[in-house]
Amino acid sequence: EGERAAHAPMAMRQRAARFAEGNLAFERALHPALDHTVPPPAKTATFTWHIAPADGHFLGRVYSDGSRLDGPTPLLARNGWAFVVLDDDDHIIASASGVPPDWVEDIPGTEAWALTQAAMHALPLCTSFVDCDPCVKAVHAGPELSCADNKPLARVHRLMHLTLDDTPRQAVIWMPAHLRPGQCGAVTRGDGFLLTEPDISGNAEADKLAKRAVELHRVPLRTRQAIKAHDELVTANAMWIARASLIANQQCE
């Protein structure tokens, strides 16, 4: 934007803003696009127990999380989810992870999928801690609002509410993410209580497992590097053409 402000008139920048999104390589035919070199994300969802409860169900405090790596473009970004369950003695009694189906395309959707997977195995009286505020708000808003046809996450929210069933909304609590041990003293959760060290460790373990799950269908490093270099080259060429065109248009005939 700084380059545009220095070299292009305001009227031209306003016109260009309408077309700023997209793939320059494809839309401007500057270079052959490399999209075909990127393997697609996993089509179907996966579920893997790391610590499996004896009968497939658990009772405890649930920490669910979703992870998205290599974004922000959908071409490279891949999602993973996980949950960890602690008992009253703060021991991990259950944990699982996996990837969501390919129609779940963002972090709030992945977070909702993670909570759904945990709820499928949770016994009554479990409390869930989620570090995604939109996901928690969708739970508290209820199915009528969060599953409306005009909501982009209606499909995954509908599954989430069906699985939570009669779980009290106050049993799904927001908590801040990515804190370190020792930062609990002045930080509160969504229920007004102070964050605890087990809260931080439970969330951190879920985050680690979710990131590990992304590796199941992550785009290979060399492909990511090639796409990055290609995008930088195309952007540089597009900027050069824009500057040359501006200078040419300012010349007197």
Predicted features by range, described:
Residues E1-E253:
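RNase H-like, metal-dependent ribonuclease domains
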